[in-house]
Structures are given as structure tokens and as C-alpha cells.
């Protein structure tokens, strides 16, 4: 028998997944008695619930319950493969502690901040919630209301949220947990190209000659895409892989150029590579002259800490951290000329030979390069700079917007791209890259939404970390969290978030499927439907929009986040939320409910129930009397059509395994900005970065600046946080899957064995991890998948019994406001 390399890789992937979950694999599976048909399982397509890869899965339903899933052979993304988490999707909805009814803190029969959680009806839950929101609106106005959403929201849910908050409550205090993972990437796209999202796609994996991973452990965090990297590398001897990280991990095992650098010095390495390209005469001057302009970024931009923090006061000299000034190629070359091989090697701790080999991957005009990055770059106090500096390398060499030449920002959540970014649930955004600060774009949104001009406020709201601080300070008093475990995920959560949640002036609502750390800190818990318990749509990292039908009912009284927002809107009239001057100028809106204004507005409600799939239920549509999801999608789509964000008609998505936008004349776009590949590029332009008015991309000159909190004599160890293969984010789903729990039941403090020996710790010893903000206990791990350099420890954050974010620093990139979870100083002490 012969076996192809691809089949071998598939078998290896299945074996790794099985071993991770302690599942024995038989050499030959037994036949099903009576054949597969006898199982009477109905199969339907859906995208995976977990990361932003967007794998297609087939979901098996029997007797109203999801009983099995498997990789979708027709899905281009994963071609039938799943990672170990994907194999257990059928179990994520059936944890023993699934929430099935609203829970309100009560004492003596009434709501009390210090009361016990008590089951209540949806009517009482919403009545209490509405009364609290109206109290805050009356006493402090709309800026005291906030909502924290998610890159796991469906496109419909995110769109409903941005309408409810901006057009309904007139508050821009809406932000997603994607602030913690993708904000730096989004800002860098906008600052460089004038449009968000990657220009390439997953097809680049089969065309590239080199893969450079910047702060990305793809083998564990994007394992299905990693199989495509491995297939390309192992099947083509000329292909090279470089992996840059602050410690050695599973992705490093495939690396031809394994690089471990000192935390924060990736900025210097990036400037060294740019200098190498210039000094060796490999700049593509024709491309640079025709398609780019140069700018210099503001420096001394601080660390996004509170204004009175001494570190912030010492580091911040720039008035506007996001400011840029026109520059030239010569000025750029002068700045990067300081980053010599010897200087950067000493600063970063990387061997000169590895740095030279890395630089040559980019400099070689005959080698196509795919750069890949995720949290190591984005969770960085200079994350926007880091993203833009990678674009510098691709723009200097012209290696961009064509098969195999691709700077590619990987995404961590299922719809961080499709919902958080494209729908516009960040504090400053509207759909399709529009912003609330632009009066023309606000007016565009108001016309599409059929609301009066002037309703949408122009001031950006509070970002994620600022929301925690405002809750703590008592200036944000009504707060609704959906589809995320924010308290476990927040940096410095003991110092900022926890006191804010329990501030007696604040009312906290959490919509979730399980009693998470965040839910248990709330005042009201609303039970939420999950994944295929609702009709949904996600947008993945390659701009692919994928839609699925509702396949099963949610348990008990659980309801989707979309239903919750729409139903909540029925409890408010415009008189209660809009100012008198708007109502006086538009008297026909006076007295209308927010539901009528936002959802039963002649646009969202224009598709009746006859358009529903007769086989699959749609809870929201049946509740409100019209096809809710189709109406929301078709109202949202015009934001992007004709503007480079074109979506296909909604019904089309039910027939395909996703389409990559822009979808023009029924055809998806794989590579953007290149003539012949992108319909928006004008004939004769060759390459056109049409997001910017001049059609050119920006190359930015910025220096290396050090992290906010380096180790010192007392706190002498770098702490890095992150994830592991078996668990996803805070573990609220995966820790309830028995096989995944057994595979990795608790977080560990990964440590260099020599550091452990010097400190007197044996393998498995319990230790205290202490920072200036807080401490936790964990156990030392000196073996296994993560091999730490001296002076660095790694702790994953999935374990609710080890809240490592008690320890982390709430520093953010001052441009993107994204949190740096990768660099703070700790000490390791015995228990």
C-alpha cells in the first residue's frame, strides 16, 4: 500500500489530536451494525465554534441533540481535518452546569447587590435590568452605559449590538474582547492600507517559499493551518520556516531558523531586516516609488497606563501617539541604519547567523514570503508598530498582494474579523471600516438605519481596559457583557475589574452559557444559547463569511444574545433615550420603542417567515414574526457594497462553504490590491492600495522602544501568558469537555530547569507567582512542550483556579489600546 504525504499528514494530525485527549486509536474501526444510515443522524454544515481559522464541520443531530461532529470534506479551509478541540465540538453545549434560566441577586425577595443568585423569569430579569439602565440614563446620561461584546458574536449579534448602543442608547461605550487580541492588527491595517483585513488568503500556504512566524505558535493555536505549512515545508525542500518567539514551543520543532529573542526586542529585529534589505541593495525601488509613501511615527508614546502612573508619566512625551508626519526613503534608511547586525544581536540575544538568515528570506527577490503573526505581536505595547514594521518589509521588497507573498495577521476568535472588525463593534467604528468620528460616515449609517441625523454620537467610547477603570472609578454604572469571560481575561483584574464589578453603584449583567468567573461576579446572569442553537454567521481570518442554520433548541429558557438584545429594546422608548432636540425636529419618532426604530423599521423586518428554511428552527424569527437574520444581514451589507467590502446575497451563503469578500458579480476575491486579482483595482494600476485616497501604502519609520515593566532586582523574571492546544481562551467550554480536561487539567508555570534549580524548585513544586499587582499559585513545569529560556516563565490563562491575570500589567498600546499580556515582571517564591 502507498500513502501520499498529505494523507500521512492527516493521519499524523489525527494521531496527535487523539494522543492529546488520551484517546486510543484502533488500526481499523469496527463497522456500524446496519450501516451508517441506521444511526438516523441528520448532518448539516457549520463553521467551527473556536478560533479564527474558520474550519468547516459537519454537525450530526439526533433527537434534538448534537451527537457528533467531523471535519467537512467540502470546506476549503480544512479539507476534512479538525484539531483536537474541533473533534469535541459536540460536547461543548452539554456541560452539567449549563445555565438554563435567568439568575438575579436577591435579598428578601428583591434585587440586592449583596444578595444571592435566585432564579427569576425573563420578565423580571428584563424589568430589573431596564429599571437599572433607566436610572443610570436619568442620573448620568448615556456615557455611563457600556457593553462589552465579543469576537464570538455572530455577525447578526454584533450588528444588533452596534445599533442598540449607538443608535438606541446613543453610547459608543461598546467594545469587544477582540480589543485584547486584534485591535493592533486592525489599526495597523488602517494606518498602512486605509482598509482593514488581510490582502491575501489561505491559498498563500501552497505558494510561499518561506514562512516567518512572529509571536505565533501555530502548531497549537492554529493547528489546521499549521498542517498546511508543514505540508508545504516537508513536500518542497527549498521551502524554509523561521519561528520567532520569546521561548521554544511546538512550532519551533519545524523551524529551519529557530529564534528566541528577549521580550520586546522584535521591534529592533524588524528594523534590522529593513536595514539589511537597504544595505544589500534589494529594495524594489520601482514598487516603492509607484505604490508607497513614507511617514514617521510619533515616539515616546507611553504605555497606556493610568495617567498618574510614574511609568506612564516618564515614558509619554508625544501629544498624539497616533500622529505621523510625511517622510522620505532617505530618512527611513537613516533611522533603520542604526539597527546593525551586532547591535541587534546584542540587544535581542539572537545569534548573528540566525538574524542574517532571517533577513535573507525577505531580501531574496526570488523567494516568496508569508509572514504570520498573532498575539505575540498584537498583545504588545508597540503592537501597531510591530504590525506596520512587518508591512514595511513586504512593501520594501514588493512581496505583497500576490500568491505566496503575503503579510498575514492570524485571528484568534471565530468572528473577530467578521463581527468585531467588519460589523464595527469597537468603540470608534461603524460597519465596513467607517468611524463615528467622521460626520459623513455617521450620516451614512443613520440613513441606512433610517434614524434621524445626529443620533449617533461622535465621541469614541471607552475601550476594554478603560471600561474596567471606569467601573472601578464609578463613572460607568450599567454594564452588559456577552459571549466572553472578561473578568478572567482582564489584566490586573484584582486591581481594576473586580472592584468595578462589585462597586455598589454599578449594575452588571452577564449573558453566558456557563457560570464563569465573570458571571459569578455579576448582578444578573442571562442564560445564552450557543453555536448551532441559533442561526449564525462568522467571518474568518481570510475574509470568508460562513453562515449556518439553527440545528437544535437551546436548553431550558436559554436564549440567544440576539434575542436578548432585541427583546430588551422593547422596554425603551425614544423619549427615554434620545434628547429633546432630536425628537422635536423629528416628531414622528416620538414615543416609538427602540425595537420599532431599530428592528421593525421596514428594513430589518422586510423578509417574512415564508423565507425560512422549513426544516430548521429559527428561534428569533419565530419570536418576532420576521426573518431576523436575513433582515439584519441585508441591512448591513449595503455598508460595504461598492466600497470594497462587498458581500453576496444572504441566501447564497447557505449554499456554499463561505465566500471571501469582496464578492463582486458573484465571484469572491482571493488577493486584494493586485490588478487582475481584485476587481477594485483600476486597469493599468498594477497594484492599487485603494483604501488610501492616493492608492499608496504607508511605510512607517519608528524605533525600538523598551517594554513598560522589565525585570529588576526584586521582580527578576519575565512573565508571558498565552494558550495551549487543548483549551480555548478562558476554558469555559473546553474545560467542560472531559477528554480535553483530562488532557490538560490545570495550568502550569513553565520554567527553565536551571532557573528552577537555582531557586530550589523541583519539577511539580507548588510556587507563588507574584507581581506588583497580585499573586497566584501554580506548579512548576520544566519539561514538555514549552522550553523556556533563562529569566522567562510562561503561564496559560485557561484555568479559572489560577487567575494569572491577577498578576499581569494593564499596559496597552497607546494607539490601538490593546493589552500587553506578554511582558511584565514577576518573582517566583516558595509556598
UniProtKB/Swiss-Prot annotation:
SMART domains, alphabetized: Molybdop_Fe4S4
Signal peptide per UniProt: 1-31
Cofactor note: Binds 1 [4Fe-4S] cluster.
EC assignment: 1.9.6.1
Keyword NAD: no
UniProt-recorded Gene Ontology molecular function terms: 4 iron, 4 sulfur cluster binding; electron transfer activity; iron ion binding; molybdenum ion binding; molybdopterin cofactor binding; nitrate reductase (cytochrome) activity
Cellular component annotations (GO), alphabetically ordered: membrane; nitrate reductase complex; periplasmic space
Keywords from the named record: 4Fe-4S, Electron transport, Iron, Iron-sulfur, Metal-binding, Molybdenum, Nitrate assimilation, Oxidoreductase, Periplasm, Signal, Transport
SUPFAM superfamilies found in the cross-reference section: ADC-like, Formate dehydrogenase/DMSO reductase, domains 1-3
UniProt main location, coarse: periplasm
Subunit composition and interactions: Component of the periplasmic nitrate reductase NapAB complex composed of NapA and NapB.
Function: Catalytic subunit of the periplasmic nitrate reductase complex NapAB. Receives electrons from NapB and catalyzes the reduction of nitrate to nitrite.
Name of protein: Periplasmic nitrate reductase
Lineage: Bacteria, Pseudomonadati, Pseudomonadota, Alphaproteobacteria, Rhodobacterales
Gene: napA
Amino acid at each position: 500500500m502507498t500513502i501520499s504525504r498529505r494523507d500521512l499528514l492527516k493521519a499524523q494530525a489525527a494521531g496527535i489530536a487523539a494522543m492529546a485527549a488520551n484517546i486510543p486509536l484502533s488500526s481499523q474501526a469496527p463497522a456500524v451494525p446496519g450501516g451508517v444510515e441506521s444511526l438516523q443522524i441528520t448532518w448539516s454544515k457549520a463553521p467551527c465554534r473556536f478560533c479564527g481559522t474558520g474550519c468547516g464541520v459537519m454537525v450530526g443531530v439526533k433527537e434534538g441533540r448534537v451527537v457528533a461532529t467531523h471535519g467537512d470534506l467540502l470546506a476549503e479551509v480544512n479539507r476534512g481535518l479538525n484539531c483536537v478541540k474541533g473533534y469535541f465540538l459536540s460536547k461543548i453545549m452539554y456541560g452539567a452546569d449549563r445555565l438554563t434560566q435567568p439568575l438575579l441577586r436577591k435579598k428578601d425577595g428583591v434585587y440586592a447587590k449583596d444578595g444571592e443568585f435566585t432564579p427569576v423569569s425573563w420578565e423580571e430579569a428584563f424589568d430589573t435590568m431596564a429599571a437599572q439602565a433607566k436610572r443610570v440614563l436619568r442620573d448620568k446620561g448615556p456615557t455611563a452605559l457600556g457593553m462589552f461584546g465579543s469576537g464570538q458574536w455572530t455577525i447578526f449579534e454584533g450588528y444588533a449590538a452596534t445599533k442598540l448602543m449607538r443608535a438606541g442608547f446613543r453610547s459608543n461605550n461598546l467594545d469587544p474582547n477582540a480589543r485584547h487580541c486584534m485591535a493592533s492588527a486592525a489599526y495597523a491595517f488602517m494606518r498602512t492600507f486605509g482598509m482593514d483585513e488581510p490582502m491575501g488568503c489561505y491559498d498563500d500556504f501552497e505558494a510561499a517559499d518561506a514562512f516567518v512566524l512572529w509571536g505565533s505558535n501555530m502548531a497549537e493555536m492554529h493547528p489546521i493551518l499549521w498542517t498546511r505549512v508543514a505540508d508545504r515545508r516537508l513536500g518542497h525542500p527549498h521551502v524554509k520556516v523561521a519561528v520567532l518567539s520569546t521561548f521554544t514551543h511546538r512550532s519551533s520543532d519545524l523551524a529551519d531558523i529557530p529564534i528566541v529573542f528577549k521580550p520586546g526586542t522584535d521591534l529592533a529585529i524588524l528594523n534590522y531586516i529593513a536595514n539589511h534589505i537597504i544595505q544589500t541593495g534589494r529594495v524594489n525601488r520601482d514598487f516603492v516609488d509607484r505604490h508607497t509613501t513614507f511617514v514617521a511615527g510619533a515616539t515616546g508614546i507611553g504605555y497606556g497606563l493610568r495617567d498618574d502612573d510614574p511609568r506612564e508619566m516618564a515614558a509619554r512625551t508625544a501629544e498624539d501617539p497616533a500622529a505621523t508626519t510625511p517622510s522620505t526613503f532617505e530618512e527611513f534608511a537613516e533611522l533603520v541604519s542604526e539597527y546593525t547586525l551586532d547591535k541587534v544581536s546584542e540587544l535581542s540575544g539572537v545569534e548573528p547567523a540566525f538574524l542574517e538568515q532571517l533577513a535573507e528570506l525577505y531580501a531574496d527577490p526570488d523567494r516568496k514570503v508569508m509572514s504570520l503573526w498573532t498575539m505575540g505581536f498584537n498583545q504588545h505595547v508597540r503592537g501597531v508598530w510591530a504590525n506596520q514594521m512587518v508591512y514595511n518589509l513586504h512593501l520594501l521588497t514588493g512581496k505583497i498582494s500576490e500568491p505566496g507573498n503575503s503579510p498575514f495577521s492570524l485571528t484568534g476568535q471565530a468572528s473577530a474579523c467578521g463581527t468585531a472588525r467588519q460589523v464595527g463593534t469597537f468603540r470608534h467604528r461603524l460597519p465596513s471600516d467607517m468611524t463615528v468620528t467622521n460626520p459623513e460616515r455617521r450620516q451614512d449609517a443613520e440613513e441606512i438605519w433610517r434614524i434621524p441625523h445626529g443620533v449617533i454620537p461622535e465621541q469614541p467610547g471607552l475601550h476594554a481596559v478603560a471600561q474596567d477603570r471606569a467601573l472601578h472609578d464609578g463613572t460607568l454604572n450599567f454594564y452588559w457583557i456577552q459571549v466572553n469571560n472578561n473578568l478572567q481575561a482582564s489584566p490586573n483584574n484584582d486591581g481594576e475589574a473586580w472592584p468595578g464589578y462589585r462597586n455598589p453603584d454599578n449594575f452588571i449583567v452577564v449573558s453566558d452559557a456557563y457560570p464563569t468567573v465573570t458571571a459569578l461576579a455579576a448582578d444578573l446572569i442571562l442564560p445564552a444559547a450557543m453555536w448551532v442553537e441559533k442561526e449564525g454567521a462568522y467571518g474568518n481570518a481570510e475574509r470568508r463569511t460562513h453562515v449556518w442554520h439553527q440545528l437544535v433548541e437551546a436548553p431550558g429558557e436559554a436564549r440567544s444574545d440576539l434575542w436578548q438584545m432585541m427583546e430588551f429594546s422593547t422596554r425603551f422608548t425614544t423619549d427615554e433615550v434620545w434628547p429633546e432636540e432630536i425628537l422635536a425636529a423629528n416628531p414622528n419618532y416620538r414615543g416609538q420603542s427602540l425595537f420599532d426604530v431599530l428592528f421593525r423599521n421596514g428594513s430589518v423586518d422586510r423578509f417574512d417567515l415564508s423565507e425560512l428554511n422549513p426544516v430548521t428552527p429559527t428561534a428569533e424569527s419565530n419570536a418576532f414574526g420576521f426573518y431576523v437574520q436575513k433582515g439584519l444581514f441585508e441591512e448591513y451589507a449595503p455598508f460595504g457594497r461598492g466600497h470594497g467590502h462587498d458581500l453576496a446575497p444572504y441566501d447564497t451563503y447557505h449554499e456554499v462553504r463561505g465566500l471571501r469578500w469582496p464578492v463582486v458579480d458573484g465571484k469572491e476575491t482571493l488577493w486584494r490590491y493586485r490588478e487582475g486579482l481584485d476587481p477594485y483595482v483600476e486597469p493599468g494600476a498594477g497594484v492599487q492600495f485603494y483604501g488610501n485616497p492616493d492608492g499608496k501604502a504607508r511605510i512607517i519609520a519608528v524605533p525600538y522602544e523598551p517594554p513598560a515593566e522589565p525585570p529588576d532586582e526584586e521582580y527578576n523574571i519575565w512573565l508571558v501568558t498565552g494558550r495551549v492546544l487543548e483549551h480555548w481562551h478562558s476554558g469555559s467550554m473546553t474545560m467542560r469537555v472531559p477528554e480535553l480536561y483530562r488532557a490538560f487539567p490545570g495550568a502550569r508555570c513553565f520554567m527553565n530547569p536551571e532557573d528552577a534549580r537555582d531557586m530550589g524548585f523541583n519539577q511539580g513544586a507548588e510556587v507563588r507567582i507574584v507581581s506588583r499587582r497580585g499573586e497566584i499559585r501554580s506548579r512548576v513545569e520544566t519539561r514538555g512542550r514549552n522550553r523556556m529560556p533563562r529569566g522567562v516563565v510562561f503561564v496559560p490563562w485557561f484555568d479559572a483556579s489560577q487567575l494569572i491575570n491577577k498578576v499581569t500589567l494593564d499596559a496597552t498600546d497607546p494607539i490601538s489600546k490593546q493589552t500587553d499580556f506578554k511582558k511584565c515582571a514577576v518573582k517566583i517564591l516558595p509556598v
